[in-house]
């Protein structure tokens, strides 16, 4: 696999120690930068004739700037709500999704709070949590393990929106090239390249073994605080070792036939990239190349490529309820949800919609106010009996954490755990059984 078909995972260790340890000598070998096989994949109608593997899947779509509340949330509760302007784009699938009101993570910070969308925990406050700000998709990916070529796929436009995080607090950046994603999914490397890659993986495994030995030799010389830091570091090494082993297992297995023409590496408008990514993600899920995928829409999404839009996306989000900007903002949000509608159609045609839990939303509710309260959240597919519009309590003492919904989603996926993020239990408003 070519070098550009990888992502970089950084492992670092901060030993803040009063113990008599030569920290400089030890850390000289721990600033490790490993290139691991690209954990990403893609999809489309092209394989509609293929009978897909029946495994539960998760696909989460995050939009950095949220969706204008006045056009997103319905006024009525239950199945008989009148579609809001934004939801009219997915009206065909009304029975296939649920919209949630008054759910959030009780965080603030505007743009700085968006990174908590799939984790429930802001990166800035993650040190106080045993699993840091690990995101829903990465917990699900751990559950998948080596059962799929890519435990998870993180895709997106541009720089994405800081949505996916490991349990050690490391951000997983999105692959932002449809061509690179296509190659990772469907282009089989020549045997000569696979031999070289296997040698690289073996060498990296040897380096990790050496680091593990050096780290363990310190355990008896550290105080309690530093031992905790060391345990976190050892956990990071074990995670990477596990990924290296999975990479070796899949190295010589043939990749599926995509059923579509190869995607070339060329300059495209953002509005051209989004449907390409959605097709690739559908194919990735359908071919069981992955069972967990995410897609990130950034603050810098190029809305001026749309007819009738003259403002940039960030500028539109600061509408102050001005009529001109709200009109153009609706054009942008209509486009995004028209692509979501197209994605739902593709998942149905691929016969995997009932096996795939699709999450659409944001860690930002209203970009104009930089609010992280009352987040826009839609959940579709998954074979659930959807409830239309669920309105949770608005009073502070009765509010339901969004993490409760994420915990229920993880349990639906097969993950056995009783808490996630800042959850207080599972979400009782929607039956996941």
Segments (PLM) and residue ranges:
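Ligand-binding pockets and gating/stacking loops
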Residues: 8-433
């Amino acid at each position: 696999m070519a070098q550009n078909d990888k992502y970089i995972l950084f492992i670092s260790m901060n030993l803040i120690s009063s113990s008599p340890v030569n920290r400089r000598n030890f850390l000289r070998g721990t600033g490790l930068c490993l290139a691991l096989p690209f954990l990403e994949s893609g999809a489309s109608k092209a394989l509609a004739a293929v009978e897909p593997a029946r495994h539960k899947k998760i696909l989460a779509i995050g939009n950095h700037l949220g969706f204008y509340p006045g056009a997103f949330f319905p006024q009525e509760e239950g199945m008989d709500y009148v579609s809001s302007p934004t939801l009219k784009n997915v009206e065909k699938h009304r029975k296939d999704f649920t919209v949630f009101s008054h759910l959030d993570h009780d965080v603030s910070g505007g743009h700085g709070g968006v990174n908590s969308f799939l984790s429930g925990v802001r990166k800035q406050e993650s040190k106080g949590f045993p699993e840091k700000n690990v995101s829903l998709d990465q917990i699900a990916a751990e559950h998948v393990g080596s059962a799929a070529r890519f435990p998870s796929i993180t895709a997106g436009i541009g720089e994405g929106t800081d949505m996916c995080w490991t349990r050690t607090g490391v951000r997983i950046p999105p692959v932002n090239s449809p061509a690179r994603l296509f190659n990772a999914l469907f282009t089989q490397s020549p045997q000569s390249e696979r031999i070289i890659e296997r040698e690289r993986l073996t060498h990296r495994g040897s380096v990790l073994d050496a680091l593990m030995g050096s780290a363990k030799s310190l355990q008896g010389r550290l105080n309690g605080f530093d031992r905790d830091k060391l345990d976190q570091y050892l956990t990071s090494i074990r995670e990477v070792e596990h990924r290296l082993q999975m990479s070796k297992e899949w190295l010589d297995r043939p990749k599926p036939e995509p059923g579509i023409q190869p995607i070339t590496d060329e300059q495209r408008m953002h509005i051209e990239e989004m449907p390409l990514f959605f097709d690739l993600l559908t194919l990735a899920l359908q071919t069981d190349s992955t069972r967990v995928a995410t897609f990130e829409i950034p603050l810098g999404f190029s809305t001026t490529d749309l007819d009738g839009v003259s403002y940039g996306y960030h500028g539109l989000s600061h509408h102050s309820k001005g009529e001109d900007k709200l009109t153009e903002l609706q054009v942008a949000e209509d486009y995004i949800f028209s692509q979501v509608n197209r994605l739902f159609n593709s998942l149905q045609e691929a016969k995997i919609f009932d096996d795939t839990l699709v999450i659409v939303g944001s860690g930002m509710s209203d970009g104009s106010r930089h609010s992280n309260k009352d987040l826009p959240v839609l959940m579709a597919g998954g074979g659930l009996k959807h409830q239309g519009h669920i309105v949770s309590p608005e009073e502070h003492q009765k509010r339901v954490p969004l993490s409760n919904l994420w915990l229920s989603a993880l349990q639906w996926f097969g993950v056995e755990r009783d808490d996630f993020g800042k959850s207080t239990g599972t979400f009782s408003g929607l039956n996941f059984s």
